[in-house]
Amino acid sequence: MVPLLLLLAAPLLAADWTQFRGPNGSGVSDAKGLPDEFGPSKNAIWKTALPPGHSMPVFSETRIFLTAYDADGKLWTICLNREDGKVLWRREAPRPRNQELHKANSPASPSAVTDGRNAYVFFTDFGLLSYGPDGEERWRLPLGPFNNPFGMGASPVLAGDTLLQICDSESGSFFAAFHKDTGKLKWRVERPDVARGFSTPVLYQPNGGELQVIVPGSYRLVSYSVATGERIWWTSGLTWQLKPTPVMDRDRIYVLGWAGGSDTGQQEDIAPFEDVLKTWDANKDGALAKEEIPDPKIVKDWSSVDLDRNGVLGARDWQMFRDRRAAQNGLTAFRLGGKGDMTGKSVAWRYTKSLPNVPSPLLYDGVLYLVKEGGLFTSIDPATGEVLKQARLQGALDQYFASPVAAGGRVYVASQGGHVVVLKAGAQWEVLQVNSFDDEIHSTPVPLGNRLYIRTRSALYAFGTP
């Protein structure tokens, strides 16, 4: 990862952790000397009680920013002192609505991003806000409501003075750029051929070219100009719902996508809308009502097919249904760059077995890592897609929402059940320690400096060696 990171802007250096999963979403840190053994009563430097939230903490030189929600339904942005964990301020965000959420999601799932001084946050039930280092509100920008039955999950990203936010939903999807100091819109591009998604974008700086931002979404990967929002290149071949954030090396981007009904062998060839209308559209209104459809599977899954929720299936609904039934899950290695449609030209390899649902992949020291629910951990050769080792993480056979991270020759993996596994990194990885907490963990760990930060449902811990 390091060669690519050196091509990007200064805030993306591996010594920083300013956004979701740190430097360009990689999950890789240059931290060293972190303890293998830690827990509520071992190697804890400090612990700060917090309201719940799935977002991970992000860091400036002296401060920590995160989002949360409380039992009264209030949304919070919280700032802590990095040295001792003391809460410096907390600010309530407006909550004009309470949108539908998946049971595994939360009202405070997207992580904050910081430019080293100010914080920027996104909430499903409001939109974007920015706070100064002392908690003064700099600007606010209402967005939504969003037609996403699972709630939003993608985190904001900074590229220089540009704040980027992807908002993919069943309808009305868009990608927008704002000036970080004013919240003023720079550009907005509509994404009508995209349904719900949760993946945070990553930045790409080609040699001699303009800075780009790569967005995984339904069915395709798209690279946009950071300056203008223009589509520069794109490629098809993704599944219908993207949750993990991709990782990159100098030449390739590794995109993971798993969605229900799209494992290998589950694909179906669905007839075009025009053909279906001829036989099913009894009232000849150019749309399909539920009572006109003889297929019980479609009727049963109505809420997932009627994307705009208007009670009938139109041409877009049906095309998205066709695309969804043809989509295939996979971890795909795409060659970076190009111009225009790169479908059929950019795929280096594809792996379709034992795929995680939510956790992002990790690329560290020449090895790709995946962690799947049930504690199935896999190492893969990024050059070929060959599995190097696959085994269960004994002692942590749990559900996983947090993504793996790496530092100092170690990989850290946190389960929902409160187990944090420390592995010796490598093709033939080894479990060194399974640490246990008496609380759930949804947030991705942060190895930074000489400390390891773990957010549980009720607290943020800083661990280190005495």
Model features per residue range: what roles?
Residues 14-466:
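Noncatalytic, solvent-exposed loop/strand surfaces
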